[in-house]
Amino acid sequence: MSMNVTNPNIAKTSMRGLTNFISDLRNSPSKENEEKRVTKEMAHIRKEFKENKNIDGYQRRKYVCKLVYMYMLGYELDFGHMEAVTLLSSTKFSEKQIGYIALGILLNEQHEMLPLIINSFKEDLLARSDYFQSLALAAICNIGGKEVAEFLSPLIQKLLIANTSSPMVKKRCALAILRMNRKHIGLVTPDSWVERLVSVLDEPDFGVLTSLMSLLIELASENPIGWEPAIPKVIHLLKKIIINKEFPKEYVYYHVTCPWLQVKLLKFLRYFPAPDDSQGGKVLGEILTAVFAQSESAKAGTVNHKNSLNAVLFEAINLIIHLDNDPVLLKQTSLLLGRFITVKETNIRYLGLEAMSHFASLSNETSIMIKKYQDTVLLSLKDSDISIRRRALDLLYGMCDKNTCKHIVAELLSYLQTADYAIREELVIKIANLAEKFASNYSWYVDVILQLITTAGDFVSDDIWFRVVKIVTNHEDIQAYAASTVFNALQSRNCHETLIKVGGYILGEFGHLIADNPQSSPLVQFNILHSKFNTCGAPTKALLLSTYAKFVNLFPELTQQTQEVFKQHQSYIDAEIQQRACEYLNLTSLNEDLMQTVLDVIPAFIDAKDNSNTTSNTANNSNMINSQDSKISSGGFNQSPQPSQQQQQQQPPQQQQAQLQQNVSSNGLDLLDPFGLGLGNQQQQQQQPVQQAQPVYQQQQQAESFSPVQSDTVSSFGQQQQQQQGGFSSPTIQASSSPISSGGSDPMQIKILASYKRLCLVSEGVLYEDSMLQVGLKSEYQSGQGRLMLYYGNSSAFPLTNFNVTLNSIAGLTLQPQSIAPVIQPKAQLQQPVTFSCTSEFTESPVITINFLTPGKPITITLRLPIVISKFFEPLRLSSGDFFARWKTISGKPLEIQEIFKSTKPIDIQSYNRVIQEGLNITVLKQVDPNPNNIVASCLFPFGSNGQPINSYIRIETNPQANMCRLTIRSQSATLTNTIKNLLISHLQ
């Protein structure tokens, strides 16, 4: 092929027609005139392309440029693409360049024309022209899809390692591979690439090396395993540049040798442990020492000189912190960082504080090294730049230990009074964590939290004051002190509502410990709390009503005052307050023994290993630099107390009162938590069998929503075996590294099945959770349409790479998931919106397959999404006569199914009604069957396969004494009849 590329520029002759056209559009007096001009020009160009068979390269180039310009103005194009493809075949650079520019603007990765130009890409890559190869590589980066990447990546790899390729082409090859791998994770694997990419590190051109290191850093960040062979050559390059001073003069930037390459080489080493061989470790130590020496000997220069020098220096510091194996270098690092945090330049101080935060988290020795800079860091809290203040706060958090805790917490409390609102929430979280983590006595911890509430109550989350009441409840030696301290704090005229909550709880439980003091007598305690009542919100008022009920049990002399309050709120507008008032009034009036049983002092919580400190998850969201700080140290005080067995069956506040009499009179059930704090251990709840007195659906409503604050799932189905009937199949899990059978005896399978069943009844919660991954969802449904938000949380300490989710539609249900990022960083979360629509009956839930890589092994998880047909049911309310009239019109199989089954737990009709109506969206019809042990229900499915809505009618006859049920379903669709049967048996059995 002959190449006419003497001057790689666009044609010397200007395209006057294009210039005039652009001028006409810019000078158009109105939008209408512009549209007329565009329409006229499009018609002319279309005619030329269609009729003029002898159009030359110049005209084709000019017309394509006009089309591209019109497209950039927002006008749609339905022609001209093939003319741009024709320009790609030209041997003239000016024409080929316009062709690539046009296709880069007009096409995208999913365009149907893309496969047609793959051969053009290939021909230009094989050409002997550097400029043609560069154009093709740029286009592949911009519009190349997965098919293009897989087809051309071997050819690009050959160009990268070929001795005949120019440095310009090699640089673009490395960057093209980087771009393709970012869009299609897993394209570049160590097995087939490491040897060839490492060989390019011998390239003498520093531009090629800089581009290649960008690629290697990206690959190592995804998964460092397999890329270790590059380490010796990277160390050799650093030695060559820093120690041997072997480098091209043109790569010296303001007296610093190739700072960009040095930074990339040092950064690459941070993804790997220290070199195994002693020689490599020794050379690396010499290199880092030389970097420090260069910074010491460097004279003050221009801003560019300082920036380039500091860039290398900070990367070397980060590498030393990562390796953590040379005491001499660590000491030098502490001295350098101490110097950096005192300079005037804000950016350097910021980087110094950030690096010192990482340095402090290494060990006790490194933390001690920087103790002498504590006063300097405290001064940084008063810096005018909020980013400096945030870094200083993080550093103080990392520097804190048992010896300095009280001083640092006192300084932070003082600073809290004047701190910006933007930083107060983070500051409160850190103070609370430090106070709990390093508390030498509990009274000091209580004082700190109360001071936090007084100073910045709006920023104190519920987690913090929940933690206070747990600790006070668990330690008798501070209960009187806490009650006295809270009582004194409540005497202030302006009390924050959070303080009132704490006061209400602690005085309700332990107010009797200070009642002997005339200044804090029972009546005084009641009056102080009630004086705040009208200023509080509904949740706090509900808690105070519980406190008043506790007062009646502790101080009978307050019965009249508290009952007056209960009577006043029997008709309160808020349902929760009204319900509590009514039930507490009856409870305190009818049976003293019952009242004493229900309102007894809450028992101590059982200590159990907790996954986080007071608010560690929230603190992590505030960029707390030491991940270890979010973990709980050993010892009872720093562990999260869990409730005793007596508290493991507590219900949410909205449901406590409705079940009050039944709960207390039932054998084996636990006392209520009148304050509604939900302080129980959900993991222990999961192990408890479902009791008759607690309806299944009420338990399911306790399930937590999936959020960055991770928590244990609550299984409301206990150890039930899965149903293998019909279409209601098990939400099985399969992992390629450790296959798990679908049998119901496996603990993981039981947990997954329980989560799946629960989410079939509620709209949000956790679907799957193990030590690496947590999958949660939130859903909503309306008129045959649904929206699902899937959450993928990385619970591990390493990134999950090649993260890919496959969701396939099923017959009757169309799913449209959005794409997600391919990597989940440690302790981070991805969200994936999914929209779906129901078109006809469907029997099974759709399957979601999750694939990702962990260090050392690939993982595949297959689950069923809790999208069941009942989510699309609509109410069908019928009178007794209408129901039986319609019932009689359907009979016989397959439209009628009858099945007898035995319940695995005591039959509770109210619980069944809630599961059927609130969970499965099936309308329970009242006063249709005179037998109170029978249930009659109906539902409407609007999307029948014949285009007509389908009515379904259900009867459930129960025998509570024998724990037997007979289920009869009649429907206008055999498929729907069988599906409803499986759903009901699964959730009622």
UniProtKB/Swiss-Prot annotation:
Record's compositionally biased regions (Polar residues): 624-638, 704-714
GO biological process, one term: intracellular water homeostasis
Keywords, comma-separated and alphabetical: Cell membrane, Coated pit, Endocytosis, Lipid-binding, Membrane, Protein transport, Repeat, Transport
GO molecular function: clathrin adaptor activity; lipid binding
Biased composition (Low complexity): 611-623, 639-703, 715-745
GO cellular component, one term: clathrin-coated vesicle
Keyword Lipid metabolism: no
Keyword Cell membrane on entry: yes
Compartments reported by the entry: Cell membrane; Membrane, Coated pit
Superkingdom of the source species: Eukaryota
Any Pfam family the entry gives: Alpha_adaptin_C
Topology term for the membrane: Peripheral membrane protein
SMART domains associated with the record: Alpha_adaptinC2
Annotated spans, Disordered: 610-745
Mapped HEAT repeat ranges: 112-149, 188-225, 368-402, 403-440
Function: Component of the adaptor complexes which link clathrin to receptors in coated vesicles. Clathrin-associated protein complexes are believed to interact with the cytoplasmic tails of membrane proteins, leading to their selection and concentration.
Family statement drawn from the similarity comment of this UniProt entry: Belongs to the adaptor complexes large subunit family.
Assembly behavior: Adaptor protein complex 2 (AP-2) is a heterotetramer composed of two large adaptins (alpha-type and beta-type subunits), a medium adaptin (mu-type subunit AP50) and a small adaptin (sigma-type subunit AP17).
UniProt cross-references to PANTHER family, sorted A to Z: ADAPTIN, ALPHA/GAMMA/EPSILON
Protein name as it appears in the record: AP-2 complex subunit alpha-2
Native source organism of the sequence: Dictyostelium discoideum
Higher taxonomy: Eukaryota, Amoebozoa, Evosea, Eumycetozoa, Dictyostelia
